[in-house]
C-alpha cells in the first residue's frame, strides 16, 4: 500500500474493465477513495462488492447522469480531487472515411469527446471551490499521429480531447487545477482484442511498428494515470502524455 493519493477522491469513468479497472486498483492501493462510473451495471455492482469502491451506473453521454456521478462522489466523500475521464468506444463500424456512416461518426464523437466535455464540466466546479484538482482525459496516440489503418471518428474524437485538454489546462492553471491528456499507444484490452480478431493483418502491421515489439498492458497505462493524478506531476498541465512504446519517436522500428 502506498500513500500517493491518500485522502483524495477519484472519479474514474470506464472503470469496470481494461485500463480503467487497472487504474481503480492502483488508485485504491495508493490510498484514494474511488467512485467508478460505468455503463456496465452488473460488473460495477460486482466490483463494489469486491473492492472498497462506490459504483454509479452512468451513460457518460447523458448530462444529468454525469452530473449525478460527480455529485455522488462529493456527497459520499466530501470532495472531487481527481477526474480520470477514461470511458471510450472503439466500434468496428468506424473505419475509413469512405465507409464510416454518419451514425457511426456521431456515436463515437458522443462517447469519446462529448463525454469528456461533460465530465470536465461536472468536475470543475468542485475543484474550483477546493482550489485544487487533477483531471486526466484519455486521448490517444491517434490524436498526434495519423494511421493508415483508419478509424476516422475515433481519431477525430481523440484529437478533440487533446485540444480541449490543452485549453482547459491553460485556463485553470492558476486555480490549482491541472488538466492533462493521457495518450496511450496500442493497449492489450478486450476492446483491442475485438479489433485484432476482426483484422489480424492490421494487427500484425500495428505490432511491427512498435519499437518495444508489444502492446502495452493496462497496468502500464494506469501507472501513467496515477502519476498524473498525484503530486509527483505537480508542474505538469495542458500536456499530451504519451505512453506508446516508442512509436511516436520512431521513423523505422527495429528489425
Residue ranges and their predicted role:
Residues 41-42, 58-69, 102, 219-220:
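The beta1-alpha1 cofactor-binding region of Rossmann-like NAD(H)/NADP(H)-dependent oxidoreductases
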Residues 120, 157, 165:
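Active-site helix of classical SDR
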Residues 94-97, 101-106, 206:
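Substrate-binding pocket helix/loop in short-chain dehydrogenase/reductase
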Residues 9, 16-17:
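Conserved glycine-rich cofactor-binding loop
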Residues 125, 170-174, 234:
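Alpha-helical segment proximal to the catalytic Tyr-Lys
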Residues 2, 94, 226, 237-255:
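Short C-terminal tail/terminal secondary-structure segment
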Residues 140:
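Residue(s) in the substrate-gating loop at a strand-loop-helix junction
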